[in-house]
Amino acid sequence: TDYYWYGDKNRMTIKESVTGEDNQIKNSQADSYRNNRNSLVASKLVLGFPLFKGELSVGGEYSSLNRRMLYTIVPEVTSNENEKVKESMTSAFVDYTRSFGALSVQAGLRYEYNDFDYYTNEIRIDLQSKTYSNWFPSLALSLPVGKTQMQLTYAADIYRPSYNELRSGVQYDNQYTYESGNPFLTPSITRNLTYAFSWKWVNLQLICSHISDEVCTMTQSYQNNPIKSLARPENINSYNSFQAGLT
């Protein structure tokens, strides 16, 4: 079991001089302060033993995180932030490896349960608090054929939005540029089917992927003002991709 604590404080002064249509110079200054604090407790257990001429591994992980996010700016050109996140994640996995002649097989299954509570000004926001339950199977087949080596794998992984991406407040960069998080983001899951072939110095790799709910930063007008832009992460529609590489 491990315990981790991390804090980050950042003060920033933004001074701007803008020449208006009347050729008059307008000076402005904004002073911001951000204070993030994190505490994490994590534990992991893995057991391995032989089974049916192969090797079986089973295990589990648990983590609990508390994060506090404070942001103030003077003058108050955007709203101040007082946000808190409480998150716990529990996972269990099983993995089995065995050879059948020249064929090597590795199969696994992982389960993850995530409980995410979101608070603004010490009030839990039910709409932005979520639970997730995911299964991630995996399979790898490796086979040497003469002087060649072939491998076929299937695996799935998950990208969970960072806490910075999940914040609800708006950060002031300058009078024309703002950025924010999006507490309604959902995790993105990528499922990959990969074929690899190698012969002497030649390596071929083909990857077919299905990406669900990828997180991308989108830019839009801020407060219906076309000269002000807001950068905000969003989930985009699911899509398929194909990659090929030859070296």
Where are these regions (language model features)?
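Outer-membrane beta-barrel signature, preferentially recognizing the C-terminal barrel domain
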Residues: 36, 84-87, 127-130, 158-212, ...
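Outer-membrane beta-barrel channel domains
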Residues: 41, 50, 118, 135, ...
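Outer-membrane beta-barrel strand-turn architecture
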Residues: 49-53, 97-102, 135, 140-147, ...
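Face-selective signature of the C-terminal outer-membrane beta-barrel domain
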Residues: 1-120, 144, 148-149, 240-247
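Membrane-embedded beta-strand positions of outer-membrane beta-barrel proteins
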Residues: 1, 58-60, 107-109, 139, ...
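Active/binding-pocket-proximal capping segment
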Residues: 109-114, 155-158, 169-171
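Extracytoplasmic loops and strand-loop junctions of Gram-negative outer membrane beta-barrel proteins
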Residues: 23-31, 74-80, 89, 119-125, ...
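Outer-membrane beta-barrel translocator domains and adjoining extracellular loop/strand segments
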Residues: 9-24, 68-77, 117-125, 163-171, ...
